[in-house]
């Protein structure tokens, strides 16, 4: 989003500030000189100069108002641009990188930047520095160059001290980003709809409040010491500037008074002195803020420079055939960045075109992790995964248009039904016939509500049951004509009847396509072509249901144990 008009207005109003200021100063000098050397014939001249001075004051007011308008507009734009750039970058990062706590901390650090503040601080330092230099030059031109050098030296020392202090304070603030994330997480537990019942039933509130207080106090103590030191430094600098200001006025008064120069010159130099001691603390403060913003900009750039995952934005498959997909996995190992051990070890699987397979095993055995690798969401630590349609290999960055999936934690979009379904293929967003057809296939059309009906209670929409949300997720998958269908244990939270319905729908969804179902409910595995039993990240058994039941192995024991629960 660009706004050239407001940007131009912003730069013009900032750059016009110093010329208007100096025009006011010198016009005031000439008015005072004319009054001092009053001449009855100078009425018109005085009137013109006073009118000019009033015009300058009026222009200064107009300039300030126009600047405020441009800053307000640019602030709104900069907030959008910052959020957009961070979200756009996030959408291009790999899932593994997104789940890394270090990446989450980097993202939070990047969000602390204010683009308009950074721009305004750069402009402020530039304008105030130019103003300061010109004021010192004018002071020097009237013979007060030693005083000008003293003031300049004090300013340089102040800028150096404030730079050091700003770096230390910002370093503390940056280091506290991860603990601030923890506080926000604890707050979310206290207000989130899903966590509130358990938090209240088990009386966890006081414990969570205590943890928040401990983190807050720790952060506060770290920052408090630096703030006291910073404010002590500011107080010392302010005292020095007050004394220097008084000395400057005294020198000007004695020097000009003893030399018999005009009152206008004294007024000019007095105003310059006042401007100097107004500009110096302002410049120091703006420079201090700029140092902090530059450090935050480095954090922002650090996040934007993270390595991106290459994905194709072309929704049309690069392979023009309707063949079912073949998946070939060889000697695959995978380890999460935060884990000390491999989550998957030496996985070797070939899923043939049109084959239905089931990944079964206890929770945490590695089933869902392998699915994420098959989806191309994680890169393998070692080994390889290849995808084929016919004789052609499907490249990893083209997988999005070849696979349709219903996740265990599928997205419950608290938005209109249209948006919930169209997530499967945004090209069909305005195609009501395709959306309705997908709903019918998923048996989600019984809601009896229009496509633009808002669902989800968060914004006052219709609340749906788990089974109804499930149907919307399946309708979303129907909208995508993929050659590989994956059902990643999305029925875990459903009642038995809804679970059976969902499984039947999945079997229809994967007709004539390669299909993978991930489940720990083994009755579902009776209807697939091949079963892979996972345990501690390894495949320990493989075969059809009948083959595995003939072997007195782990699958048979698990199946019989689950079956006994229903007898």
Annotate each PLM feature.
Residues 262-338, 379-381, 430-438, 514:
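ABC transporter TMD-NBD coupling linker
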Residues 69-88, 150-191, 261, 285-305:
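Cytoplasmic coupling helices
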Residues 91-135, 191-202:
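Juxtamembrane loop-to-helix connectors within ABC transporter transmembrane domains
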Residues 35-40, 138-153, 229-298, 303-304:
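Helix-loop-helix
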Residues 504, 512, 521, 526-567:
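C-terminal portion of ABC ATPase nucleotide-binding domains
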Residues 8-63, 139-169, 259-263, 390:
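Transmembrane helix-loop-helix hairpins at lipid-water interfaces of multipass membrane proteins
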Residues 410-459, 481-483, 554-557:
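Conserved "ABC signature" C-loop
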Residues 109-119, 171-178, 188-191, 200-247, ...:
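An intracellular "coupling" helix at the cytosolic face of ABC transporter transmembrane type-1 domains
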